[in-house]
Structure formats: structure tokens, C-alpha cells
Amino acid sequence: MSLELLKPLKNSFLNEIDENYLQGSLYNKIKIHSESDGLPNHELFDVCLVGVEENRNSFFESKKQNLKSIRKELYKLKFGNWKIEVSDLGDLPNGETVDDSYHALYDICKELLSKKTILVIMGGSNDLLYPIFKSFDTHNEKVNIVSIDNQFDLYQDSDLISGRTYMNKIIFDDSNKLNDFTNIGFQRHLCSIDEI
């Protein structure tokens, strides 16, 4: 089971968070996969958060992402009057190879989708969208994708899935699962006529 690959959040990180400052916040409403509490039962939750460190196939020179900073800001947000249960399942570490990371992410997404759980991925690079997209293969629904990017990432230069080729792989995927693709923020001077 790929969920067992998820690393818990360190107790030292959770102790840094001032609960008084975060009163009424998301932090006080969610169950967190921590060193002390272990992995929450994901079947009890409507929304699960997962941090992903993988960025080796990013188009951009990248350094390790600071998922702690992302979480600190996310946890500060106020929880509305919603009737949903939310869990932070921790972080998926890099696999030995990028393909190992893709496979683990695919399995996690597929498992959570089978329980009708909404998955929110934090971190990682654009190419991770491909294994997430592929996890919908066993579902009847078509997939809508919204990307916020200055380019369309439709390059066809190689078989490698990267931050510049992932959308081409999705659009021409044999599963025909893509219903709609919307790109927000593309810059005309960075996109070829063929892409537009």
C-alpha cells in the first residue's frame, strides 16, 4: 500500500505552531499524520493533503521545496462552516528513480479516488500531473485540468515526461480521459503559434 510510504510530519514542526495564534484555523480542524499519532484512517476524510518532494524532471533548476513553509501558511487559513473532514497525510519522499515517485503517486491517487476522497497535492513539479491524470483511468468520469502557467508545456521533444512535455502526454493519451484543459496566465511571447 503506497500510503505507508508517506512520511509523518515531525513532532518538532508541529510543536513550532502556536495553537493560540491559529484558533479557528485549519490546523485545529484537521487530523495530521504525525510521528506521535501515526497515519489517520484516510477512509474517514473527504479531503486529504499530501506533500510531494519530487522535482527531478522539472524544466527549471530546482532545489528542495519547503513543504513546512507551505503548511505553516495553509494551516493559518480559517476553516469555514463546512461539513467536511480534512486530513494531512504527510509527505511522499522521492523514490529511487523519478519513475518510482510517479508510480507511488499514481497508487496513492488511485487509492484515494476509489474512496471518493479529494486529494490536494502540495509541492512537486508540473510533470507530476501526468501520474495524477493516469490515476483516473479506472474511473468513468472525464478529467478537467486547470493550469496556472506562463506556457502551455506542449513540447514534443522526447518521450521523457518533464515540466515542459507533460501536457502533450496528457492531451494525446490513449485513455481519452481529458474533457477540458484551461490554462490561466499564458504569455503569448512564450507560446508558439501552433500551441495557441
Language model regions located:
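Conserved alpha-helical scaffold segments that buttress catalytic/binding sites
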Residues: S2-L49, E54-I196
